[in-house]
UniProtKB/Swiss-Prot annotation:
GO biological process: L-proline biosynthetic process
CDD domains named among the record's database cross-references: ALDH_F18-19_ProA-GPR
One of the record's GO cellular component terms: cytoplasm
Lineage start: Bacteria, Pseudomonadati, Pseudomonadota, Betaproteobacteria, Rhodocyclales
MF terms in GO: glutamate-5-semialdehyde dehydrogenase activity; NADP binding
Full protein name: Gamma-glutamyl phosphate reductase
Assigned protein family: Belongs to the gamma-glutamyl phosphate reductase family.
Cysteine disulfide links: none
Enzyme class: oxidoreductase
Subcellular locations according to the entry: Cytoplasm
A Pfam family matched in the record: Aldedh
C-alpha cells in the first residue's frame, strides 16, 4: 500500500498541473473504451452476480451490483458529461483590493489524493475516476469483493483512457486485493491520502469514520422522508410517493418514512395504501394511520403497527413507516428528530409552508413537490457524484467536482509592504 500511495501522490502533482484538454481527452477515451468493452463488462458482471447469488447475498446488494447494457451506456455518458462540465481547477474568485494596495482572492485547487472505499456498485469505479480526474485529483479505489471482476474490467477501460491522453495510469488505481487489511492501510496514510470517501453499508462507514487518520466525506444512512402537507396538490401526491418509495428500494435516496397531515390523511392514505399494497410494500403505521389504512381494506402481512425503531430505520427494502402528524410543525420536528440528514421532501402548494420546510429541515437536500429520488449528482447537474455527504463541513449533499476541490488564498501585490 505504501507503493500505491507514493505513486498516487506523484500522479496527483501531475494531474494538478494537467490542462483541461488533457483531462477531457482522457475522459472521452475512457467513455469510448467502456462502449467498446460492453460485452466484456457485462460478462464480468454476470460472473460477479452468479457468485453473489450463490453466496446468498441479499437482493438490495444484488440490485446495487447489477450492470445492464443501459447501465454501461450510462457510465460512458456520465464520463462524457463530466468532460463537458467546466473545469473548477484554477478558478479565481472574490478578488478584492485592500486599503494596503494588495489584491486578495481565492483560487480553487485539487484536494490531492482521494481514497474511495465502496461495496457493490461497479459504476462507482467509473464515476469516481471521472470526478477525481476532472478535479485534478489522483484516486485510489477499493471496491467490494462481490464486484471484483466488474471493477477490474472497468479499471482496464480507465487505464486505456489515461494512456490515450498521455496521463499517468497511476492517476487512478483500483486495488485488486480483497484483503480487508488494505482498507485499514488506506485510511491511515495521511502522508499519501488527503481524504477518504466511503460508500457502502452503515457498518463499513462507521468503521472508517472511527479508524481513519484522514478526513472522511460520508453519510451513514438514508432515512429520507416525504411529508404530505394539508395544502398538497392531489394530482402530485400519489405519483411522487410511488416514485420516491418504489422506483428502487436499495438506494440511499429512497423514501423510508411518510408523514401525512391530519387534515388530509383520510383523503390521501387510502389511495397511497392501496398503491403500496399493490406493489407488495409493507406498511408500518402509527395508530391513527393504521386505522385509516384498515378502513381502506388493507390487512394482513402488509400492515403492522410501527415501533419507535421504525422511525429511525433505513430499510433498503419494500417497507415504509407511515405517521399522521398534526401539521407542518410536527412534521419538521419529527424529521429533525429521526432523519439521517440525507433528503426530505414536502408536497404542498402553500408558499409559506414550503419556505419554512426548506429553512427549518436540517438535511443535506430539501425538496418541494419532487421525489427524494432526485437527490443524486447526475440529476443535480454534477455529471456524476463521488458520494453524498450529510456532514456540514467542507461538502454537503451530492459531492461532485467542486466538492473535490479546496480553495487557497492568493495575493497580488505591486511592491507593497506591511506597515
Amino acid at each position: 500500500m505504501q507503493t500505491v500511495g507514493r505513486e498516487a501522490r506523484a500522479a496527483s502533482r501531475t494531474l494538478a498541473a494537467a490542462s483541461t484538454d488533457a483531462k477531457n481527452s482522457a475522459l472521452v477515451a475512457m467513455a469510448q473504451a467502456i462502449r467498446d468493452s460492453r460485452d466484456a463488462l457485462l460478462a464480468a458482471n454476470a460472473a460477479d452476480l452468479a457468485e453473489a447469488r450463490a453466496a446468498g447475498l441479499d437482493e438490495a446488494l444484488i440490485d446495487r451490483l447489477t450492470l445492464s447494457a443501459k447501465g454501461v451506456e450510462g457510465m460512458a455518458a456520465g464520463l462524457e458529461q463530466v468532460a463537458a462540465l467546466p473545469d473548477p481547477v484554477g478558478e479565481i474568485t472574490d478578488v478584492k483590493r485592500r486599503p494596503s494596495g494588495i489584491q486578495v482572492g481565492k483560487m480553487r485547487v485539487p484536494l490531492g489524493v482521494v481514497g474511495i472505499i465502496y461495496e457493490a456498485r461497479p459504476n462507482v469505479t467509473a464515476d469516481a475516476a471521472a470526478l477525481c480526474l476532472k478535479s485534478g485529483n489522483a484516486a485510489i479505489l477499493r471496491g467490494g469483493k462481490e464486484a471484483l471482476r466488474s471493477n477490474q474490467a472497468i479499471a482496464s477501460c480507465v487505464r486505456t483512457g489515461l494512456a490515450a491522453a498521455g496521463l499517468p495510469q497511476t492517476a487512478v488505481q483500483v486495488l485488486e486485493t480483497t484483503d480487508r487489511a488494505a482498507v485499514g492501510a488506506l485510511i491511515t496514510m495521511p502522508e499519501f491520502v488527503d481524504v477518504i470517501v466511503p460508500r457502502g453499508g452503515k457498518g463499513l462507514i462507521e468503521r472508517i469514520s472511527s479508524e481513519a487518520r484522514v478526513p472522511v466525506i460520508k453519510h451513514l444512512d438514508g432515512n429520507c422522508h416525504v411529508y404530505v402537507d394539508d395544502h398538497a396538490d392531489p394530482a402530485k401526491v400519489l405519483p411522487i410517493v410511488e416514485n420516491a418509495k418504489t422506483q428502487r428500494y436499495g438506494t440511499c435516496n429512497t423514501t423510508e418514512s411518510l408523514l401525512v397531515a391530519r387534515a388530509v390523511a383520510p383523503r390521501f392514505l387510502s389511495d397511497i395504501g392501496r398503491m403500496l399494497a399493490a406493489r407488495n410494500v409493507e406498511m408500518r403505521a402509527c395508530p391513527e394511520a393504521l386505522a385509516l389504512l384498515r378502513e381502506a381494506g388493507i390487512e394482513g402481512a402488509r400492515l403492522s403497527p410501527a415501533t419507535e425503531q421504525d422511525w429511525h430505520e433505513e430499510y433498503l427494502a419494500p417497507i415504509i413507516a407511515i405517521r399522521v402528524v398534526a401539521g407542518l410543525d410536527e412534521a419538521i420536528a419529527h424529521i429533525n428528530t429521526y432523519s439521517s440528514g440525507h433528503t426530505e421532501a414536502i408536497l404542498t402548494e402553500h408558499y409559506t409552508h414550503a419556505m419554512r420546510f426548506l429553512r427549518e429541515v436540517d438535511s443535506a437536500s430539501v425538496m418541494v413537490n419532487a421525489s427524494t429520488r432526485f437527490a443524486d449528482g447526475f440529476e443535480y447537474g454534477l455529471g456524476a457524484e463521488i458520494g453524498i455527504s450529510t456532514d456540514k463541513i467542507h461538502a454537503r449533499g451530492p459531492v461532485g467536482l467542486e466538492g473535490l476541490t479546496s480553495q487557497k488564498w492568493i495575493v497580488f501585490g505591486n511592491g507593497e509592504i506591511r506597515r
